[in-house]
Amino acid sequence: MTPDILPTDGYEHQLAEKSARLQAMMSPFQAPAAEIFRSPAEHYRMRAEFRVWHDEDDLYHIMFDQQTKLRIRVEQFPVASLLINRLMSALMTAIRAEPILRHKLFQIDYLSTLSGKLLATLLYHRPLDEEWQQKARELRDQLREQGFDLQLIGRASKTKIMLDHDYIDEVLPVAGRDMIYRQVENSFTQPNAAVNIHMLEWAIDVTQHASGDLLELYCGNGNFSLALARNFDRVLATEIAKPSVAAAQYNIAANHIDNVQIIRMSAEEFTQAMQGVREFNRLKGIDLTSYNCETIFVDPPRSGLDDETVKLVQAYPRILYISCNPETLCANLEQLQYTHKISRLALFDQFPYTHHMECGVLLEKRD
């Protein structure tokens, strides 16, 4: 696969291969047939990063071939959203003509939304001065005149310059409601917005008859917490990254949701708090014992859940587990299978044309 050509004719085959692979991995745990959620065959990725190559008077985006490590010039990138593709061309044309903006520019990061907003970060191997800021403002205004709803950011060593602000707001149609999600530059967001909608709607569906409260670990900007709030009395969610916590708090207010509480701590710290091993000032004013959490939601990093967190989640009647790495999910299921059974399984094709799989399982306590 080259950056400018996607093997769209092979989309169905690669999806069928992933489905078979996931089903085989889950068969030792008596999993039901997987529900399959497709991605758009192209223009599905809402963010992209490119190195910038200087060749005398020319300047262009590049990527590196994963096998040969050779650089590849990138004019169009069908993996990324149409909005990013449009901006790539317009932005590079403008920068190419301005020496102050192109000098020691080595990378450009793009973030886009289904709501039509864009954020571009220009990364430099040099200090950014007032002259750079003036030219960057002119560039931003020029691109806005071309119809781009754009935020522009400059980065250099220990420097971050925001011309306006460092976020854009996404609006996702989720199970009959428009959900607003603030997305902060350089913070995690789901890369495939269409598949993210599938994940949110599946999570809502599998918990529609849930009772009590929901506990979520690793909540990020509140992506799942806010969508799932409609199915629960209250939601208690943890997140460690400050920008994500701030975005989550904004999203709670923007969506007029009054039953979600975000606390800034790691899953490991929360486990210690629940077990009474440590006390945390961050939990002052929050009575953990008042929550009747019958469902726990986890969307861990690729490494999966650590042993202590596995023990923590086993205490809950229902576990909703979204995994970006089925191998570590299976490792966790080796322990979870003794207390819970898989009642729903889903494959989300978040990363088409790669071996990566995103999946979800609903686990329910054995009788």
Swiss-Prot record:
UniProt key word Nuclease: no
GO MF entries: rRNA binding; tRNA (uracil(54)-C5)-methyltransferase activity, S-adenosyl methionine-dependent; tRNA binding
Pfam families per the UniProt record, alphabetical: tRNA_U5-meth_tr (PF05958)
GO cellular component: cytosol
Family matches, as SUPFAM superfamilies: S-adenosyl-L-methionine-dependent methyltransferases
Family statement: Belongs to the class I-like SAM-binding methyltransferase superfamily. RNA M5U methyltransferase family. TrmA subfamily.
Purpose: Dual-specificity methyltransferase that catalyzes the formation of 5-methyluridine at position 54 (m5U54) in all tRNAs, and that of position 341 (m5U341) in tmRNA (transfer-mRNA).
Protein name: tRNA/tmRNA (uracil-C(5))-methyltransferase
Native species: Yersinia enterocolitica serotype O:8 / biotype 1B (strain NCTC 13174 / 8081)
